[in-house]
């Protein structure tokens, strides 16, 4: 040990002694893949979810109690799954949550808060068992990081099991998205995108977006771009008027003269000349920006042409073409190539949530659909670079797969209304 390290070590020992503490003796953790685990008690919904989602969904205390009762029923079903009923190498924690709800700005017909079933979720976590030495004692724990398995309840919106966004819609706040495509089955459950769906009719969860609806969103997105450039042009035009105003110019030069005098510059005319040059440069820059062949002026002209492109196209379409289901080809090089009503390779149907799927006659607390998310992370074992899926640990993904593969699907279907 060199002198510097020796001094650092001695200093640390002295500091601990002064503080009256002791130096804990730690050891590396040891994984215990054969140790028996346990199912820990359910975490109450009140401790795992905030009030935001409850308020947004206009849920009463009675509704929340009933919804938690449904989640507890699901917990009981999953707890009986042979693959995880008697945990070995991991312990299980389960809890629920209530999702938020908001009406999108561009979502005609989306129900108001309180008109849909309570949306939330159920989380299954298989945490590894390990131990370590501390101060001469063996400490065993079953916590830490793990791959969680989520079950979404009564949630059918975009972005849950697929990114689903449409670049041509920009940042518009809409409930429309690209439909998650079917990808076969896992453990007897249909896979759509990155999720497994348990429902009366998985394909009925979403309703087609008409071509008119898809193109209207393009119009709105491009109108926003035009508006932004128009606002920039207005600001730059106003600034150019100020720069060219003789009174403003005289004021700036007078202020320059006063500053030069206050600083006792040896040659104030040089400084004043610099200010005049700066004014000229600012004017030239603004003129360039406002030119329709360059800068903001050109960007505005381009944005207006792009807006006309879609509005002109809409005007050319027949009522039947506007009503046809829209399809989005992400790699299309033109607007018309991207938005088509003809299903083809690389083209995904555009959809919205089918709010009519939910039976309004049932209590709002009733579960009507479950989507198991994050399937790629834990089930894509063919990808050798997927470390989570191929982990040798009995916790995390291995336990998640055992749960999904051995859980009683018929009991879950019976649990759904």
Predicted regions span which residues?
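Bacterial N-terminal signal peptides that target proteins for export
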Residues: 1-12
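Bacterial N-terminal signal peptides
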Residues: 11-21
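Short, solvent-exposed recognition patches
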Residues: 50-365, 375-376
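Surface-exposed amphipathic alpha-helical segments
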Residues: 381-417
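Acidic/histidine-rich, surface-exposed loop or edge segments in extracytoplasmic proteins
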Residues: 33-54, 368-392
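Boundary at the C-terminal end of the N-terminal hydrophobic targeting segment
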Residues: 22-29
């Amino acid at each position: 040990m060199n002198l510097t390290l020796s001094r650092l070590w001695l200093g640390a020992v002295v500091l601990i002694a002064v503080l009256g503490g002791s130096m804990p003796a730690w050891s590396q953790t040891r994984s215990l893949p054969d140790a028996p685990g346990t199912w820990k008690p359910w975490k109450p919904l009140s401790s795992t979810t905030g009030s935001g989602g409850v308020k947004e969904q206009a849920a009463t205390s009675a509704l929340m109690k009933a919804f938690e009762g449904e989640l507890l029923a699901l917990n009981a079903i999953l707890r009986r799954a042979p693959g995880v009923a008697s945990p070995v190498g991991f312990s299980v924690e389960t809890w629920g949550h209530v999702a938020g709800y908001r009406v999108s700005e561009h979502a005609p017909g989306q129900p108001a808060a309180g008109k849909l079933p309570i949306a939330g979720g159920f989380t299954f976590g298989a945490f590894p068992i390990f131990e370590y030495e501390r101060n001469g004692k063996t400490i065993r724990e079953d916590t830490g990081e793990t791959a969680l398995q989520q079950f979404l309840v009564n949630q059918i919106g975009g972005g849950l099991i697929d990114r689903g966004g449409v670049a041509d819609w920009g940042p518009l706040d809409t409930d429309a998205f690209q439909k998650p495509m079917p990808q076969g089955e896992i453990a007897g459950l249909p896979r759509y995108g990155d999720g497994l769906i348990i429902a009366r009719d998985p394909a009925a969860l979403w309703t087609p977006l008409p071509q008119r609806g898809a193109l209207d969103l393009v119009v709105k997105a491009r109108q926003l771009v035009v508006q932004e450039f128009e606002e920039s042009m207005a600001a730059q035009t106003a600034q150019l008027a100020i720069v060219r105003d003789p009174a403003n110019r005289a004021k700036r030069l007078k202020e320059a003269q006063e500053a030069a005098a206050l600083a006792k510059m040896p040659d104030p005319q040089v400084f004043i000349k610099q200010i005049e040059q700066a004014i000229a440069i600012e004017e030239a820059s603004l003129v360039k920006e406002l030119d329709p062949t360059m800068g903001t002026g050109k960007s505005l002209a381009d944005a207006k042409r792009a807006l006309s492109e879609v509005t002109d196209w809409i005007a050319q379409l027949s009522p039947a073409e506007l009503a046809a289901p829209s399809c989005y080809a992400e790699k299309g090089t033109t607007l018309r190539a991207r938005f088509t009503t003809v299903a083809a390779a690389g083209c995904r149907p555009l959809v919205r949530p089918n709010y009519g799927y939910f039976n309004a006659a049932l209590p709002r607390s009733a579960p009507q659909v479950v989507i198991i998310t994050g399937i790629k992370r834990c089930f894509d074992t063919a990808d050798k670079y997927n470390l989570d899926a191929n982990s040798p640990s009995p916790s995390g993904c291995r336990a998640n797969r055992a749960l999904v593969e051995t859980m009683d699907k018929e009991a879950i279907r019976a649990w759904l209304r």
